[in-house]
Amino acid sequence: MLATSDLWFRYQNEPVLKGLNMDFSLSPVTGLVGANGCGKSTLFMNLSGLLRPQKGAVLWQGKPLDYSKRGLLALRQQVATVFQDPEQQIFYTDIDSDIAFSLRNLGVPEAEITRRVDEALTLVDAQHFRHQPIQCLSHGQKKRVAIAGALVLQARYLLLDEPTAGLDPAGRTQMIAIIRRIVAQGNHVIISSHDIDLIYEISDAVYVLRQGQILTHGAPGEVFACTEAMEHAGLTQPWLVKLHTQLGLPLCKTETEFFHRMQKCAFREAS
C-alpha cells in the first residue's frame, strides 16, 4: 500500500503540506486537484522519496518509508513517476535504449529486458514509431515513451503529473485509453492535473487540496458536485457535473454516456 500519515513538509519555514492523511491503495485511479501552489507537486516528490517530510510519514507496505539507498531503490521500482515534461526523463536518442535504461542499471537479463520493453511499447501504443529517433517524436509520443519507461519496472503505482497537458483531443483520448489499460493490469494510478474533466472521468476517488491541506475527498461525482467546495478550492466543476448541478440533467461519468442517455430521452419523447 502507498499512503501518508499526518504528513507535514515545509520549505525553510513555510509549510507546504499540512497533516495529510491519504490512502492511494483504496482506488485504482486517484485524482489530485487544486489551484497552483496547493502542494500537489511537493506531495508527488514526497511519495517518490525525492523529499523527506519533517513530520509524519509516507507509508509503503504499511511501514514508514525507508530512506536508505536500498530502501529508495526498492520503492522506485514499485512507485514510478512520469513528469509533465517528458524531456526530463528521456536520455537516449533511440526509444528501445531509453526504455531499457533503468533495467540495464538493475542488471536485468537482456532477454527479460527485450520482453518487458516490447510489452510496454504495446501497452502505450508505441510499436508503430519505436524505430524513429526520439527527437523526431511529437510531444504526445514522447509522453508515451516516458510512461513505457516507467512500466518496464513493473511498478504497482504510477504517479502521472499532468498526463494530458499539451495533447490534442485525439492524444488526450489515447492517454485515457492508456491509463485504463494500465489499471486493467492491476496497477494503481495517481494523477495530478488541472484537467478537471479528465480527473472526473477517469478517477475512482479524488482529493481536493487547498494550501497544503485536504479540503475534501471522496467519489468524483460527490466531490465535484459540491459547488461551495469547488469555489473554495479555486476550481471549476467538470462540464458534465455542471449540467447536473445547474440544469438538473442526469449525472453522467463520460461524454459518451451523456449523449447516449440524451438520445434515449429524445427517442422516448418523439415516440
Swiss-Prot record:
ATP binds at residues 34-41. The keyword Cell inner membrane applies. PROSITE patterns: ABC_TRANSPORTER_1, ABC_TRANSPORTER_2, CBIO. SMART domains: AAA (SM00382). One of its GO terms (cellular component) is ATP-binding cassette (ABC) transporter complex. GO terms for biological process: cobalamin biosynthetic process; cobalt ion transport. It is a peripheral membrane protein. Residues 2-236 form the ABC transporter domain. One of its GO terms (molecular function) is ATP hydrolysis activity. Forms an energy-coupling factor (ECF) transporter complex composed of an ATP-binding protein (A component, CbiO), a transmembrane protein (T component, CbiQ) and 2 possible substrate-capture proteins (S components, CbiM and CbiN) of unknown stoichimetry. Expression of just CbiMN in E.coli confers some cobalt uptake. Belongs to the ABC transporter superfamily. Cobalt importer (TC 3.A.1.18.1) family. This is Cobalt import ATP-binding protein CbiO.
